[in-house]
Amino acid sequence: MTATIGHFLQNLCGEYSNQKQAFENPPLFAHIFLRYKPIEHLQPGSILLEQTYAVDPKHPYRLRVIRAEELTSGIIKLWNHTFKEPDRFSSATFDQDCREKIREEDLILLDHCHYQVRQLDDGFHGELEPGCRCIVRRDGKETYLVSSFHLQGDELSTLDRGHDPQTHDRCWGSIAGKFHFQRISHWAENIPETWL
């Protein structure tokens, strides 16, 4: 792995909450936890991503494995994977035994749903690869995902929206702008030294 990826993962890994935003604007923003935990026994750069609502912390509504790879100097690609059986690994973020059972064959690569990340003066900026080809089925309808994030220090902002493939109108996602998360736990110490 490269120094660029190591630096990115050290900045990323941890637990984040948008509690302040959710409490100030409860009709517009749910209280959500984002968690990024290294999966040491998989390929270098493999991170477990969990998203849960604060009201239901033991049942993630999104569970992914992202894998960081530097394609060209300074540009990181985050390969995005889902689980064949996500319920088997719903406790993996905090349960090491469960996490150690994750195997490559448990994962499904999500075509066209990978991120490109660049480090700029104000932190790391990530965007879904262009092309409007990351298809998300929501409420019985196919939409394409437009997604971005900005990581600076202990602050992480994200914006995910689904659009109609024909009209390009927004079908779902935040109507009030970005979600703003604050890191509440650092997990960089869980990154294997061989990754850095």
Swiss-Prot record:
EC class: lyase
Molecular function as annotated in GO: lyase activity
SS bond partners: none
Keywords attached to this entry: Lyase
Keyword Lyase: yes
Keyword Lyase in annotation: yes
InterPro entries: CpcT/CpeT (IPR010404), CpcT/CpeT_sf (IPR038672)
Any matching Pfam family: CpeT
UniProt EC number: 4.-.-.-
HAMAP family: Chrphore_lyase_CpxT
Role played: Covalently attaches a chromophore to Cys residue(s) of phycobiliproteins.
Homology family: Belongs to the CpcT/CpeT biliprotein lyase family.
Name this polypeptide is given: Chromophore lyase CpcT/CpeT
Organism: Synechococcus sp. (strain WH8020)
Taxonomy of the source species: Bacteria, Bacillati, Cyanobacteriota, Cyanophyceae, Synechococcales
Gene assigned in the entry: cpcT
